């Protein structure tokens, strides 16, 4: 536990001091919190609505994120951020030294190596999760705000003629997010992912079902 704490502190110091974590990440980041993210949304969205514009937002939730971070992918990402050498080897050993067994009708299976997930309760879990999720927002057209593994994609609609372009660009970003999840063996929980339609002009019709269309 002491060794894990020292390494977690060193990794966080390296990542944050070199600006390697997304500016839109509010989870497990010094000086950032859930409240900061909510205040940012409140300020931005009130300004947009006061200007008589509209907002489309998509909130996404990764299914069991702490349990599904794929170890080979995580190690690849750590290396790409400059965490290499002996530290990288130590982390590889740390991730590979866990096994799981299943008991059924009083019979215990043989041990099976755990190949995904970060150890629950470990002080390393939050920072490793941050590294894994960090590149999700790369190459997107719209800002993706992150609270650890929860994310929100936003687009402002300034006039009705922007509606189709907004839908197309959000679809394009969802395609990129889907590609990211396929590449890194992750999945999003449709029951906890939602579209949001904010307008000062209500009442208004049913918003486009972006998520249901995306998953079809």
Positions of predicted regions on the chain:
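Hydrophobic alpha-helical membrane-association signature
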Residues: 37, 41, 128-132, 169-173
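Short, charged alpha-helical motifs in flexible N/C-terminal segments and linkers
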Residues: 46-54, 178-196, 203
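Catalytic palm subdomain of template-directed nucleic-acid polymerases
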Residues: 64-81, 152-182
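Short, conserved micro-motifs composed of acidic
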Residues: 106, 160, 172, 187-216
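Conserved pre-catalytic core of RNA-dependent polymerases
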Residues: 1-119
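Active-site palm subdomain of RNA-directed nucleic acid polymerases
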Residues: 7-25, 55, 126-158
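Eukaryotic intrinsically disordered and solvent-exposed regulatory patches
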Residues: 42-45, 138-139, 182
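Short, conserved phosphate/pyrophosphate- and ester-handling motifs at nucleotide-, phospho-/glycolipid
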Residues: 121, 125
């Amino acid at each position: 536990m002491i060794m894990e704490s020292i390494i977690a502190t060193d990794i966080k110091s390296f990542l944050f001091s070199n600006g390697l974590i997304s500016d839109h990440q509010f989870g497990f980041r010094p000086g950032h919190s859930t409240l900061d993210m909510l205040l940012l949304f409140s300020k931005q969205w009130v300004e947009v609505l006061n200007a008589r514009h509209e907002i489309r937002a998509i909130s996404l939730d990764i299914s069991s994120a702490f349990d599904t971070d794929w170890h080979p992918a995580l190690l690849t990402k750590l290396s790409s951020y400059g965490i290499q050498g002996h530290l990288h080897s130590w982390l590889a050993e740390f991730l590979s030294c866990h096994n799981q067994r299943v008991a059924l009708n009083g019979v215990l299976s043989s041990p099976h190596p755990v190949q995904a997930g970060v150890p629950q309760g470990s002080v390393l879990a939050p920072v490793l999760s941050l590294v894994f999720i960090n590149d999700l927002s790369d190459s997107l057209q719209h800002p993706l705000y992150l609270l650890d593994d929860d994310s929100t994609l936003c687009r402002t609609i300034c006039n009705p003629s922007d509606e189709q372009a907004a839908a197309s660009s959000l679809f394009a970003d969802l395609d990129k997010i889907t590609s990211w999840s396929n590449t890194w063996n992750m999945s999003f929980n449709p029951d906890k992912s939602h579209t949001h339609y904010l307008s000062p002009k209500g009442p208004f019709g049913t918003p486009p079902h972006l998520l249901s269309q995306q998953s079809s």
